[in-house]
Amino acid sequence: MTDSDYTVIMPFFNEENTLEIAVTNLVKEDFASEIILVNDGSNDKSYEIASSLQNKHKFIKLIESKENKGKGHALKLGINVASKKFIGVLDADLEYSPNDLKNLFKEIDINNLDIVCGSRFIGDFKRDNIYVRTYLANKFLSMFFSIIHREKVTDIATCLKVFRKTLFDSIDLKANGFSIEVEILAKTLSKSDYFKEFPISYTARSYEEGKKIKLIDGFR
């Protein structure tokens, strides 16, 4: 694995069908020198898979929460132990591409930014299977967020983000669930104006396939 200033946090809950593929794809991209897997109380074989991956790769750390407390809780656990200059987040469900995350890291590093968020609604990138109601709700929330925080944001619900680690020294994250996506951006933007969105691809999975985030999470 490359020697870089990049940490990737991958929270997971009951992702036995995708976790190994997600981590393997991330490792192949060879840009993160620290990968933190956070088990959010899985009751399938996810933890065993993660443990095997940790044993295989010395740059992988594994954190376990015995109870399922939510993505926000898992992210906070990962942030607390991250040791690199920049922190990125990648879900284990294969909806987002690790290659896109690599591009976000390059963007934040080369241009001396503090926050870079992937957006599914700029550029000509692939966007498969997005529910119409999800798209419309996201557009409304993004517009509302942009007005409140005086920063144009086109994809408030994106789960692909990169931050300068020092931002977390002066903010207190409260959310334990999926509303962390909105809170983490709102609070980091309050500490920095060096923000940019970057186009990314996206392949949505259905609720039958294990999708967990719901429309209501954006309003919490």
Regions from the PLM with identified roles:
Residues 66-81, 86, 98-178, 204-220:
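Acceptor/aglycone-binding surface of glycosyltransferases and processive sugar-polymer synthases
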Residues 15-18, 42, 71, 97:
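Donor nucleotide-sugar binding loop of glycosyltransferases
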Residues 152, 174-176, 185-203:
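Catalytic donor-sugar/metal-binding loop of nucleotide-sugar-dependent glycosyltransferases
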Residues 15-28:
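Short, well-formed alpha-helical segments that are part of the catalytic scaffolds
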Residues 5-7, 34, 183:
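Cell-envelope/extracellular polymer assembly enzymes that use nucleotide-activated donors
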Residues 39-48, 94:
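A conserved acidic beta->alpha catalytic loop
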Residues 33-36, 47-81:
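Conserved donor nucleotide-binding strand/loop of the catalytic core
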